[in-house]
Amino acid sequence: MSKTFDLGVLYSRSGTYQLLSEALFTGAMSAIESVNANHDLPVSFNPIVRDPAGELTNYAPMCAEILSSSNAKHVVGCVTSSSRKEVIPELDRAQATLWYNVPYEGFETSARVVYSHAATNQNILPLLGWATRHFGMSVYLVGSNYIWGWETCRVMRTRLEAADGSVLGERYLPLGDTSVESLIEDIEKSRPKFILNSLVGASSYAFIKAYAELGQRDPYFASDNCPLLSCNLTEAELPVLGNAAEGLISVGPSFRKNPTSNGEGSSLERTAFQSVLTLAEALAHGASGPFDSYLAQHGARYGIDPATQHKSLDVHIAQVRNSAFKILHSWSDIAPDPYLTRPSRHPKFSDPMLKVVQA
């Protein structure tokens, strides 16, 4: 007989990062439907859905309400690192687990979180290594003004400067800010070899569109010469970007060659889907009590590192061509290293670092 488990679903259906949330929500709910339709599984899920509407202050109380008003011990949710950090105290109090399905900046482990998407050595490092080999050693850093933007740019800056590269500019915008004119002007003056875009949601879309216009005015900023790079752009956001997305370079655990108009098949959707299936399998195998104790013994079965509760992932660098991602470089099964203390887990390049000759 199937046992039904309450499962929290905590994604914003509106707000500046709505497209990301919608992809994650779709993946999670599709997986719940799949589990419930699979009569060979001895478990099913009752989703307890809450919508924080993109407001940071809503996450902790809504997470607490899920955990106190139901029997849920697992929550699939959160997009920003700020929201993830907001809910961890509530998870601690309830001995519950968050399945976090978004790329993030690393430098965190929590017994209350399964980090299912890319960490620092699975996104920032391979992207930087690839970009410096193909475009050069000077970068302009752009990010949203919270921990994701700060830490992504910090790691990029530290690594690049250690390799005798240079950061020509570093700017941050509040979440949702779409005033990018002065930012574009500064980039135009600085003329870097590439730009790392760590903006999120509406800010990112405004910046990408403005940069595409700059590339039309000045061939130096064409995508084949001075590209925009991202650690978090997926198929879920391509429809809203239209032609402005052409030439963008991103990194992720998977890309779909022919995404549908609604972003179906993005790594966000697939990661959320897989997290729910993994949880169902773990519960079917008798997982009970604090989930970190179960992962300490059985995490490797699911590709989860018991020491950090991060997943091993494939890593792909891809570029948007004709409204779809084309994979440029890949690594298989990269183990997580969120604190960047295990160089053996960092993606390697078979070619030596290119020496860029300045005219």
Show which residues each predicted segment covers.
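Hinge/beta->alpha junction and helix N-cap segments in small-molecule ligand-binding domains
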Residues: V49-L56, V102-P103, S116-L125, G143-C153, ...
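Hydrophobic alpha-helical
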Residues: S81-E86, E188-D218
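Extracytoplasmic "Venus flytrap"
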Residues: T4, G8-M29, R50-G54
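Beta-alpha junction/loop-to-helix N-cap segments that form part of ligand/metal-binding clefts
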Residues: L24, N38-G106
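Segments of small-molecule ligand-sensing domains
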Residues: G265-E269, A280-K348, V356-Q358
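Extracellular/periplasmic periplasmic-binding protein-like sensory domains
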Residues: Y211-L277
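Short beta-strand elements in bilobed, periplasmic/extracellular small-molecule ligand-binding domains
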Residues: N38-G54, S110-R112, L160-D177
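Extracytoplasmic ligand/sensor domains, especially the bilobed periplasmic-binding protein
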Residues: K73-G165, F221, P227-L241
